[in-house]
Amino acid sequence: MPGIIDSSSKQSAIVGNSYGSTELSHNVPIPHAEGDNVVVRTRAVSVNPVDAKMMGPYVTAGAIAGCDFAGEIEAIGPEALSWGFKIGDRVCASIMGMNPLEPDHGAFAQHVATHANALVRIPETMSFEEAAALCTCFMTCGLALFQSLGLPGSPVKPSASATQVLVYGGATATGTAAIQLLRLAGFTPIATCSPHSNELVKTFGAEATFDYNDPECAAKIRAFTKNGLRYALDCITNRSSMQICYGSLGRVGGRYTALDPYPEDIAATRKIVKAAWVVGPIMLGHDIGWPAPHGRKADPDLFKFGMEWKKLVEGLMAKGVIKPHPLDVRKGGMERVIECMEAIRAKEVNGKKLVVSLRENH
């Protein structure tokens, strides 16, 4: 087993407790690099809305939370050697934190265990903090845009037609990732956002922006798209967002994909629109043990898509053609992760991706 870790020692990590929430523990075992697992010394993590939603029945006591991390490989399991990684390699990944089926796999730890196939190599020109902010957003967007919505093109094989695609929530981290991918794939992204975020969203590549608080938002999108919009990605997913997306889609209908379960009664208002929602961790190739409606069996086809898409994202990172959302980097250790989750729950985060730097905390 290349790399030696004293797994009898303990580490700091954010774990589930018996009260249905998370807490900082300094008594978490350091994981072994067994089977196809790799252990990474964490240098930065990012905090996503999904992390803040891990409450109540989604919490497994003792399981490590967190999806996005970046760091350096410090141990490699024997079945992971075929992936070509070496000790000291700079890597990042999006994994399934708070996982009842693999409770020792989670990003919010000083030493992260993950299956080798989830890892993405970080280019030398990119910082750990930037890399930690990329994977969940860009992996989920790939699934939503090029698998669920079925867009006819990709960043490496652009569409011949600059078809318009609506990104609802364009100023979110997922929204700016989607806009970049759409541009690279030859599409024309348009987006909803608050007026104060217009310049940010256009900087990432949106052709036009629309104020979601405007009662005429959907009508203005229909006018701009000449009643021909066929694709909508909903990065917010609530009643208002779905109503605007459905009202924006053209007269012949189209496809709508959300990042969370959507209101079925709104979906029923337009039968000519095909609605779907995605769960990013399904691309990792394992069962998802979260409660319904998120829990599900592994899907070999989506795993295959995920591995192909991960390789594509790694290539885009190496070329320097994608960038993270504007970062709010916080220092001070794992306790800052708890603060970030609380800030997301309190809706205090706007236009920034929360990243915790752990470089000085080992």
From Swiss-Prot:
Recorded metabolic or biological pathway in which this protein acts: Secondary metabolite biosynthesis
Effect of loss of the gene: Impairs the production of phomasetin.
InterPro entries: ADH-like_C, ADH-like_N, GroES-like_sf, NAD(P)-bd_dom_sf, PKS_ER, Trans-enoyl_RdTase-like
EC number: 1.-.-.-
Keywords linked to the UniProt accession: NADP, Nucleotide-binding, Oxidoreductase
Domain of life: Eukaryota
Residues bound to NADP(+): 50-53, 171-174, 194-197, 212, 259-260, 349-350
UniProt keyword Oxidoreductase, yes or no: yes
Keyword Membrane assigned: no
Pfam families, sorted: ADH_N (PF08240), ADH_zinc_N (PF00107)
Main enzyme class: oxidoreductase
GO terms assigned for molecular function: nucleotide binding; oxidoreductase activity, acting on NAD(P)H
Residues given in the record as substrate binding sites: 136-143, 280-284
Function: Trans-enoyl reductase; part of the gene cluster that mediates the biosynthesis of the trans-fused decalin-containing tetramic acid phomasetin, the stereochemical opposite of the HIV-1 integrase inhibitor equisetin. The PKS module of phm1 together with the enoylreductase phm4 catalyze the formation of the polyketide unit which is then conjugated to L-serine by the condensation domain of the phm1 NRPS module. Activity of the Dieckmann cyclase domain (RED) of phm1 results in release of the Dieckmann product intermediate.
PANTHER family assigned to the protein according to its UniProt record, in alphabetical order: HYPOTHETICAL OXIDOREDUCTASE (EUROFUNG), TRANS-ENOYL REDUCTASE STHE
Subunit structure: Monomer.
Similarity-based family: Belongs to the zinc-containing alcohol dehydrogenase family.
Name the UniProt record assigns to this protein: Trans-enoyl reductase phm4
Gene source species: Pyrenochaetopsis sp
Lineage, highest ranks first: Eukaryota, Fungi, Dikarya, Ascomycota, Pezizomycotina
